[in-house]
Amino acid sequence: MVSIYAFIYFIHNISQSIQISNILQNIFETAKSRLTKLIDTEEKQKSDFPETEDWKEYHSEKSGYLQNISFTNLVDICESEDIKLHILPVKGIFVLSGIPLFRCNKDLDEDKVKKILSNFNFSREELVADNYTLAFKQITEIIVKAMSPGINDPGTAINGIDYLTELLALRMKKKDQSMILRDEVAYIKLNTIDFEDLLYNIMAPIRTYCKNDIILVQKLLLMFYYLEKQESDNTNYCKYLRKEAESLMKDAKASIENEEDIEKATELAARFNLHTTKD
């Protein structure tokens, strides 16, 4: 009887692992497709955009996740009215009614504002296809849940780190801002989440739940080492990687008691040229 229960438990765990693996794979593929498309679009952008701090702000009249923006229509409006727009919320995030939605380099009457606002579509549901940063959030949540005390599944956490590594390497090819052009003229500027903020939002919860596990600490250090060697659009990206790697080592050394484990982590950190001590 005991062997039957053990077999059922084994089958349940295997099925659950396969299900989580499929979820991770689907999240990864959707985000990879979205990121690749954004990067390909950016490679064609060679125009500058003026500073917008002094432009007039116009506010959202709806609440919801900013999912779809009709850029073709907005560029048509920009051309016909001889204006430029700076869209303030990051596409895919939740927007509250009344917050600044866009800036314009000219004052707009009520009809023109409503015409522009009609090209912003909101939803009550988040989608990775519209917001690639949601994929980082979801994979991070899977890693954190896998390493929570009640579950303790380092295998799933390691798989999640592998997917994060590949997506971060792809994100490093992307600029921290995007523009919409027509005939090599930039009409619309889009805000995107900075790589530094994205990396911190990923690593802060992961450090909390993984700092006690030497295997996962090593895995994360190898992730940083790999990412530092990747092609990057911004030289500061490597500085942000180093900063997060240093924070990881600091937390790990404060949490791991085994001196041999600390020695192994320190050796890996040395490969990453981190200035760490064994105490």
List the predicted regions and their residue ranges.
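Well-ordered secondary-structure scaffolds
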Residues: 1-279
